[in-house]
Every structure is written in C-alpha cells, then in structure tokens.
Swiss-Prot record:
GO BP terms in the entry: dephosphorylation
Residues the entry annotates as binding Mn(2+) 2: 83, 228
EC number: 3.1.3.16
Protein name: Protein phosphatase PTC7 homolog fig
Species name: Drosophila mojavensis (Fruit fly)
Catalytic reaction list: O-phospho-L-seryl-[protein] + H2O = L-seryl-[protein] + phosphate; O-phospho-L-threonyl-[protein] + H2O = L-threonyl-[protein] + phosphate
Cofactor: Mg(2+); Mn(2+)
Length: 312
C-alpha cells in the first residue's frame, strides 16, 4: 500500500519528518569526519500549510514562501535561508519559487571545490547573477541570509540582506546577532528579478549591500539561523532561555527536538491576539496602529551546534 504523510496522524508525520531531516543531514556530513563541523537541525512551518503536510516541505526545501539549504564540503559548511516577498502574489508571481531558486543556486555554488566559506556575500552575488541570466527566469523578490563555517580556522562568516538573520550563542549568552536591513517598517532589503525589463521596481537591492561579519567560534557554540517568522514572534530573551540548556549539545535528536519546539512556539505566538510580540513592538516604534499580537508568517529555522573534534 502506498501512503503519503496526509494518511498518517499528525504525531506520526512529525516523527517521519524529523527522521527524514536527520537522515539527510547525517548523510551530508560523513565525508568531513575529523574536521570542525556544524551539527544541524531544521524545521519550519508555512502559515498556510496543513498541520500534517511536512515531508513535501522538507523535500523541496520550502516552507510556504520561505526556502533554505545546507551544504557540507571538506572546506566549508554553508547554511542559508530566504524569505520570498509575498506582495508579488497580486500579480500571480510565486516569490517562494524565487527564494527556492536562489537557495538552490547558493547550494550549487557552495558545493564548488574552490569554495572555502570565507566569502558568503560573493556566493550570494554569484547566485543572484545566475538567476538574472536564466532564459526562463524566475521572477519575484526575496531576502537572504547565508552563514558559513570556514573549517581551517573555525571561523563563522555571514552575509545578510533584509530581515532574516542569525544569532550565535556561547555559554547561554548572545555572542553575536545580525542586524536587520530595512527601507522602512516591514519593508526589508530584497533581491528582485522583475517580470519585465522596464517594469518600475522601487525595491531592487543589490547583493553587494549584504552586511557581512566573521566570528571565531568554538566547541559548543550554537548558531540559530531563521527567517523573520521566528524573530518577529519570539523575543530574544525567550530564544536564549530556550537554547541555554543546549550549550555543547552534539546529539542531533536533541537539537531537532529543540528546533521543533522553537517552530511550535513561534507558530503559537504568531496566532496570538494578546502577546506583545517583537513585531508589535516594532510597529509601535514606527507609529503604526498594529496594537498587540503576533504576525502570522512562514517560519524557517536552522539550529546548528559547533563541534570541534579533539586532535589526536
């Protein structure tokens, strides 16, 4: 008998989903044994998805209009998230497909033998340039955040354009958090390919504008990479409190459990009408009449633990 995830109970489908993620991530890291690595766990939720429609989302690296990728080579570990801008829907354009294509290109460039993870902004530049040159081009807009681990010196490099972002935690405290890039309230910097060359496109930012950083990381550090569906709904203090017990955690199943809970938390708070969410606070600071409550949105989260093997 053939079955799909929709034939299963929600709980069973989650187990299948989590096991599938772990299989994919474990198989991507076997060739880098003995080198510094990122032990990764991934989860997400589309604001429109059915409660049990998980496996498809993982298989095509999409959660609604969000997309993601992870890559592992002997020189570098690379992770990325992209958030397609939903405003294109009124023109019949799926920005989720744009975000997915951008992440696919980033993944392919990250797998090149010469790429060592030291310049994720160039990775973003090359990937976006390739999108613009495609004959059957994919149109839309997306934010993007790339984080790479340069294995040789155990340095984390990043390139962030827009309001997705990442945090690095050490010993239960925030070591680094990326800054948002906004044109105005709820209007992030974004990469755009318009459907027509002459089409007026106000928000056509350049990948060269991505903010970069580099951080020396060590055993046990945690890296949290996510789209704004997480950061707009879960305050930093709650994220830190949730992640504090995971310092030094290298068991993938424990990281997966933690990232599952983060997504569940963000989803619950996004639907709240009473919670004072980070998005509501930003709206108030911008003199917007938003009141209180969360922001229903697609959510994509990658949680990674830095593992530096002992040198024998």
């Amino acid at each position: 008998m053939f079955f799909t995830v929709r034939n299963l109970s929600n709980r069973t489908s989650q187990v299948v989903n989590y096991a599938y993620i772990q299989y994919r991530l474990l198989s991507s890291t076997t060739k880098t044994k003995g080198l510094p690595r990122l032990i990764k766990a991934i989860q997400g939720s589309s604001k429109d998805q059915l409660a049990d429609d998980h496996l498809h989302m993982i298989d095509d690296h999409r959660y609604g209009e969000d997309s993601w990728f992870v890559s592992s080579t002997p020189k570098a570990e690379t992770m990325g998230v992209a958030d397609g801008v939903g405003g294109w829907r009124r023109l019949g354009i799926d920005s989720g497909l744009f975000a997915q294509e951008l992440m696919t290109n980033c993944s392919e460039f990250a797998e090149q033998p010469q790429y060592d993870g030291s310049d994720p902004r160039q990775l973003l530049i090359d990937s976006f340039d390739q999108m613009k040159k495609m004959s059957g081009k994919v149109c839309g807009s997306s934010t993007a955040c790339l984080v790479t681990l340069h294995r040789r010196d155990c340095t984390l490099h990043s390139a962030n354009l827009g309001d997705s972002g990442f945090m690095v935690l050490r010993n239960g405290k925030v070591l680094h958090r990326s800054d948002e890039q906004l044109h105005g309230f709820n209007t992030p910097y974004q990469l755009t390919v318009a459907p027509e060359p002459g089409m007026d496109c106000i928000l056509c930012d350049s990948p060269q504008q991505a903010v970069t950083s580099h951080i020396n990381v060590q055993q046990g550090d945690l890296v949290l990479l996510a789209t704004d569906g997480l950061f707009d709904n879960v305050p930093e203090s709650m994220l830190v409190r949730h992640l504090q017990p995971l310092h030094g955690e290298t068991r993938m199943e424990h990281l997966q459990h933690a990232v599952n809970r983060l997504v569940d938390m963000a989803k619950t708070l996004s639907l709240s009408n009473t919670f004072q969410s980070p998005f509501a606070l930003k709206a108030k600071a911008s003199n917007m009449n938003y009141g209180v409550g969360g922001k229903p949105d697609d959510i994509t989260v990658i949680l990674a633990s830095v593992d530096v093997p002992d040198k024998d």
